[in-house]
Amino acid sequence: MTVPHIPRGPVMADIAAFRLTEEEKQRLLDPAVGGIILFRRNFQNIEQLKTLTAEIKALRTPELIIAVDHEGGRVQRFIEGFTRLPAMSTLGEIWDKDGASAAETAAGQVGRVLATELSACGIDLSFTPVLDLDWGNCPVIGNRSFHRNPEAVARLALALQKGLTKGGMKSCGKHFPGHGFVEGDSHLVLPEDWRSLSELETADLAPFRIMSREGMAAVMPAHVVYPQVDTKPAGFSEIWLKQILRRDIGFKGVIFSDDLTMEGACGAGGIKERARISFEAGCDIVLVCNRPDLVDELREDFRIPDNPTLAQRWQYMANTLGSAAAQAVMQTADFQAAQAFVAGLASPQDTAGGVKVGEAF
């Protein structure tokens, strides 16, 4: 059977369960689609996951990019057979207790284990690290954040990024320009952050600026409004994405929208309008999660935006290690020692407050 050549489109979709249905195969063959995000509902065990990712990658060429939210703590989609990853705040606690060097070493090991284990199962990308500062205001961020100190966040994220690279994965910093100061959860409401741009510059924006300079591959903007900068949420804002992120900060990587089905995005209109505004604001790729009906609505008469960098940016997010090589790495004593070290950092407190961030069952 000939595998069809279909350039990757700018939409990332999802699926319902452990295997692809015929309807889902047809959806994923649509030229509008370029990637797929997996959730807990798609994971039964490691062998099933490998079968699923192989099935997805066999559909078309170039292969669909497969992503997951696999940060650690409350946001680790795959559990059985994977190393339990600590909440990122654990690395911040090491920073405070044992110093920057110890914390950076730990962050590098977490990134390496996280990426290698996912790579072994055919996953290209984890949407990590969280670059939000922990101001103590935002439960949906909370211990997903490394620290409140921008320098600590940037240095720990950079160390994690180096570990991800060893495991064959790129980084995706989120949620630009910072979700940690607001109280609301943008999955459920549209939060507002009333600080000025200068206040954001001295704190929340600093990790994004540093990580951009250090090769961060992708950014995901927040569904948060910053009224003193723009009346539109950051993910729908040309000011935030084209002027501040691209021009002022100089970010040259991929911009993924956050999920366009989140409540924080719904005020922009229907799914076609949300996608249009996202693309016009500067997003390269939009996520449409947990609503296959909206993916179908979006791809009906879909016109792929003029983005000459899209193919290159998609390919840049592809895994660079490969499943077989990652599985070989996992057999080494050095890697198994890293797994034991990382598992020792995790604790039941990491998931206090629930594991369902952004998840639908």
Swiss-Prot record:
Main location: cytoplasm
Residues where substrate binds: 69, 77, 144, 174-175
Cellular compartments per GO CC: cytosol
Protein EC: 3.2.1.52
Source superkingdom: Bacteria
Enzyme class (EC, first level): hydrolase
Active site annotation, chain numbering: 187, 258
InterPro entries given in the database record: Beta_hexosaminidase_bac (IPR022956), Glyco_hydro_3_AS (IPR019800), Glyco_hydro_3_N (IPR001764), Glyco_hydro_3_N_sf (IPR036962), Glycoside_hydrolase_SF (IPR017853), NagZ_Beta-hexosaminidase (IPR050226)
Cellular location(s): Cytoplasm
Protein name: Beta-hexosaminidase
Biochemical pathway: Cell wall biogenesis; peptidoglycan recycling
Single GO BP term: cell division
Alphabetic keyword roster: Cell cycle, Cell division, Cell shape, Cell wall biogenesis/degradation, Cytoplasm, Glycosidase, Hydrolase, Peptidoglycan synthesis
Biological role: Plays a role in peptidoglycan recycling by cleaving the terminal beta-1,4-linked N-acetylglucosamine (GlcNAc) from peptide-linked peptidoglycan fragments, giving rise to free GlcNAc, anhydro-N-acetylmuramic acid and anhydro-N-acetylmuramic acid-linked peptides.
Protein's organism: Neisseria meningitidis serogroup B (strain ATCC BAA-335 / MC58)
PROSITE patterns: GLYCOSYL_HYDROL_F3
Reaction(s) catalysed (UniProt annotation): Hydrolysis of terminal non-reducing N-acetyl-D-hexosamine residues in N-acetyl-beta-D-hexosaminides
Family of the protein in this entry: Belongs to the glycosyl hydrolase 3 family. NagZ subfamily.
HAMAP family in UniProt: NagZ (MF_00364)
Site label Important for catalytic activity, positions: 185
GO molecular function, one term: beta-N-acetylglucosaminidase activity
